[in-house]
Regions:
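Beta-rich interaction/scaffold domains
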Residues: 1-90
Length: 90
């Protein structure tokens, strides 16, 4: 049986999932900075970007499937990142 996470670990994991969501959305939407440059993975190939998105989608899917969440988490952005990420990867 898996060890139950502490409240601090759950909060840290939820924040880490948010970081993955931000990364996925930045890649998928080709988010740019004020200078018009891509904010993440500027010099990466499409294959490298897809690999990064795929890894992060897998991570947030795994984390969301854990059963010891508190029940007050908002999964809206996570679900959108999963859907958008899978569509991007193809």
């Amino acid at each position: 049986m898996a060890e139950t996470r502490t409240d601090a670990e759950i909060a840290q994991n939820y924040k880490a999932m948010g970081d993955s969501v931000d990364l996925i959305q930045s890649i998928v939407t080709e988010k740019k900075n004020a200078d018009g440059e891509l904010m993440v993975m500027q010099n990466a190939t499409d294959a490298e970007k897809k690999e990064r998105v795929n890894i992060n989608v897998g991570y947030i899917e795994y984390m969301k499937a854990l059963t010891d969440w508190k029940g007050n988490e908002d999964w809206t952005d996570v679900d959108k990142a999963i859907t958008d990420g899978k569509a991007y990867v193809g």
